[in-house]
């Protein structure tokens, strides 16, 4: 019979104080010799006595078993096992029975000499007729499912495990291994066609039933069973099982390699509190193939060897609560529907101490149930669309990722569906390629702690949470590079993201993206954003809050902070540097926005520090602001009722604008000093009616710049800090509109062709309450056209 080697195992039944065991090493399948003998079996076997049944040839064994099988159903198993056991073990070389316990009669040696009996006197010498006749011992019978019967040595070998046997008076056979451990054979059935033998028996204490079938598979029924599989186990084919146990407290020690394919099961246990110690490594391939399956609660599986799962197979599957699986060796899972470890039940624990490599649609760990914990101490590599490192469906899941997490090709590193999930990622994370996600959680109240550094590129996403009240703590540094790449993404209300580590966002990537109301982003680390379409922190939702404690550096057309929604608040304490056209440090699209720039801001080469598009915006620039270069802007607001408080000093150079407001009822309070120099430079620029500018700090304008420039009716400027204006085209205060009011309470010094105050409009009022000095050709203190 052609077949792969199946159970390479020791059959060990350790049962409540006594049992039997033998450690088995790998052997190849052996085909025994047998003769073809025509045998006629009695028609009515049921009428034969046990003694008559014993004398039947082996060819009748299947007939005997068929006739007596109904006894098992009705509970009369004793008659069956008593009848068959002794019959089969007395099988001789040609598969006929020999009930005699004595050796068979020696064959004739073909000699013609006839022995001469001695005479009564005893004087004659009997001539020798040749060599002594020596009885030929029967050859061992080898069956194709790795069982050998040696009647000469009175031994039975199962997969290289040798037992001595004894025939009992009740027809059963007693087995004993070299360590003195015992068991009983109750049933022995030979398949003449395939030359295999099936064994069935009990443990020494009668508590456990065991079977070794024609396929070389071990099936055990009973509690407290132990099976030691020292040799290699190969299982191939649908419905094939290497070791099968039905009972509680089962123990399987798999020291040899476990190789499962074709839909078979390597180890299959049904019962609570099972333990499998798999030291020999495991290879599982093909759909429906399972290396280790346990159906029962409180199972423990230890996979110390390396595991290779492919083509839809499953390494370890537990269906029951409170399961623990320890994968201490390396695990490779390759192919769609392939799974390394699968648990269906609550309170599961999976410890992946070895490295895991998940490829082409496979799943490393899959848990379905509440209160699951996965501890990934080893490194996890996930590559390929549909591939997942750790997948949990259930509430209160916990994943501790101590090893490195590397995800590419559209795979997911950690994927959780359920509320109140927690992920502690200490090992660092690298995610690349579209659809790739390092950590994904679908559920409310998720918490993710990324303590290691994160590198996200080429369209990948580091952490994504879809649910309300999520918290993501990025304590390590984060680098996001490439269009559609995202460091952290949350879709849900009341999200909190804490970026304690530094963030570097490049070439179209996004550091943090939140879609939902009442979001908070705390950026304690420095944020660097470079490249068109790049964004450090992006929020779409009302009542957003961003606390930027670290430095904010934006260039190349990127955005540092971008919020769409009403009532947003940004507290920027760390300072801001913005350069290049289209670059914006802080942008808010929505009404009632509040921005506090407590640190210093440096804006250059066409960049914008703060831009708000919406009504009732308030921007407080408490730190110093420097704006340098054409089309560079410190603060820009497009909306009515805007308020800008420049408490720090402002320096505007070479065509830049300190504050620009487009909208009615705007107010600019310049408590700090304002210095404006260069053609096209403007300190404060407002386009709208009813504008108010309170210039409490000094105003110094030169090189053709404008200190305050308002276009609109009913504008009011209160200049308390004094004003110095020099050079042609330089204007301290310019208003284009009717009904303007200017109050210059401080002293004014105008020189070299400059103009102190200019109003172009009707019904203008200018009050110069301080001293005014005008020096030089084309210099003008106050000019009104209207």
What is each model feature region?
Residues 1-786:
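Long, low-complexity, polar and repeat-rich extracellular regions
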């Amino acid at each position: 019979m052609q077949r792969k080697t199946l159970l390479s195992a020791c059959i060990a039944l350790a049962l409540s104080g006594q049992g039997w065991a033998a450690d088995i090493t790998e052997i190849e399948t052996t085909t025994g010799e047998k003769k073809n003998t025509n045998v006629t079996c009695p028609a009515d076997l049921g009428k034969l006595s046990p003694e008559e049944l014993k004398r039947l040839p082996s060819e009748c064994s299947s007939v005997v078993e068929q006739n007596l099988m109904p006894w098992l159903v009705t509970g009369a198993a004793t008659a069956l096992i008593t009848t068959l056991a002794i019959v089969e073990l007395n099988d001789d070389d040609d598969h006929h029975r020999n009930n005699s316990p004595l050796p068979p009669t020696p064959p004739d040696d073909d000699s013609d000499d006839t022995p001469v009996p001695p005479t009564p006197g005893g004087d004659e010498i009997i001539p020798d007729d040749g060599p002594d006749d020596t009885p030929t011992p029967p050859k061992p019978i080898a069956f194709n499912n790795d069982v050998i019967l040696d009647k000469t040595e009175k031994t039975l070998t199962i997969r290289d495990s040798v037992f001595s046997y004894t025939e009992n008076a009740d027809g059963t056979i007693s087995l004993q291994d070299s360590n003195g451990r015992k068991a009983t054979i109750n049933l022995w059935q030979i398949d003449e066609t395939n030359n295999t033998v099936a064994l069935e028996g009990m443990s020494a204490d009668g508590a456990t039933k065991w079977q070794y079938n024609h396929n070389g598979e071990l099936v055990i029924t009973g509690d407290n069973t132990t099976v030691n599989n020292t040799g290699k186990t190969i299982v191939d084919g649908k419905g094939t099982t290497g070791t099968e146990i039905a009972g509680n407290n089962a123990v399987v020690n798999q020291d040899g390699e476990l190789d499962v394919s074709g839909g078979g099961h390597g180890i299959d246990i049904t019962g609570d509190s099972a333990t499998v110690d798999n030291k020999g490594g495991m290879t599982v391939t093909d759909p429906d193939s399972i290396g280790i399956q346990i159906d029962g609660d409180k199972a423990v599986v230890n996979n110390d060897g390396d595991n290779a799962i492919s083509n839809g197979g499953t390494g370890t599957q537990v269906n029951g609560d409170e399961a623990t699986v320890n994968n201490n060796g390396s695990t490779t899972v390759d192919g769609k529907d392939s799974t390394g470890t699968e648990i269906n039940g609550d309170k599961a624990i999976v410890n992946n101490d070895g490295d895991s490599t998940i490829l082409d649609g496979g799943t490393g760990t899959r848990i379905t149930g509440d209160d699951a914990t996965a501890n990934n101490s080893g490194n996890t590599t996930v590559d390929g669309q549909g591939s997942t490192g750790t997948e949990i469906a259930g509430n209160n899941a916990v994943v501790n990722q101590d090893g490195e997490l590397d995800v590419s090709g559209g795979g997911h590193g950690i994927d959780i569906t359920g509320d109140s999930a927690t992920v502690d990622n200490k090992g660092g994370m690298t995610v690349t390629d579209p659809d790739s996600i390092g950590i994904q959680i679908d559920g409310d109240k998720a918490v993710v702690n990324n303590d290691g550094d994160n590198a996200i590129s080429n369209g990948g996403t580091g952490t994504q949470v879809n649910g309300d009240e999520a918290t993501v703590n990025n304590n390590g540094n984060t680098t996001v590079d490439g269009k559609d790449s995202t460091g952290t993404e949350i879709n849900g209300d009341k999200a909190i993201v804490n970026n304690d580590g530094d963030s570097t966002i490049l070439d179209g990537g996004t550091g943090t993206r939140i879609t939902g109301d009442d979001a908070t982003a705390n950026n304690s680390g420095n944020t660097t954003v470079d490249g068109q379409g790049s964004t450090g922190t992006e929020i779409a939702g009302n009542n957003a809050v961003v606390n930027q404690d670290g430095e904010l550096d934006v260039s190349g057309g990127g955005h540092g902070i971008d919020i769409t929604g009403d009532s947003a608040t940004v507290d920027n304490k760390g300072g801001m540097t913005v350069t290049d056209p289209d670059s914006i440090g802080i942008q808010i699209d929505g009404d009632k926005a509040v921005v506090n720039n407590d640190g210093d801001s440096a804006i250059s080469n066409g960049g914008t520090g703060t831009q708000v598009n919406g009504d009732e915006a308030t921007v407080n620039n408490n730190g110093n602001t420097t704006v340098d270069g054409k089309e560079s802007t410190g603060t820009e607001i497009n909306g009515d009722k805007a308020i800008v408080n420049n408490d720090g000093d402002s320096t505007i150079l070479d065509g830049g604008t300190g504050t620009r407001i487009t909208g009615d009822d705007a107010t600019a309070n310049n408590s700090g000093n304002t210095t404006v120099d260069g053609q096209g430079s403007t300190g404060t620029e407002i386009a709208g009616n009813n504008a108010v500018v309170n210039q409490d700090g000094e105003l110094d304008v030169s090189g053709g710049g404008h200190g305050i420039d308002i276009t609109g009716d009913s504008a009011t400027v209160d200049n308390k800090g004094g004003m110095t204006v020099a050079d042609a085209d330089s204007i301290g205060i310019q208003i284009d509109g009717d009904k303007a009011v200017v109050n210059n309470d401080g002293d004014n010094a105008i020189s070299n062709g400059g103009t102190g105050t200019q109003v172009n409009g009707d019904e203008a009022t200018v009050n110069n309450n301080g001293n005014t000095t005008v020096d030089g050709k084309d210099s003008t203190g106050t000019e009104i056209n209207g």
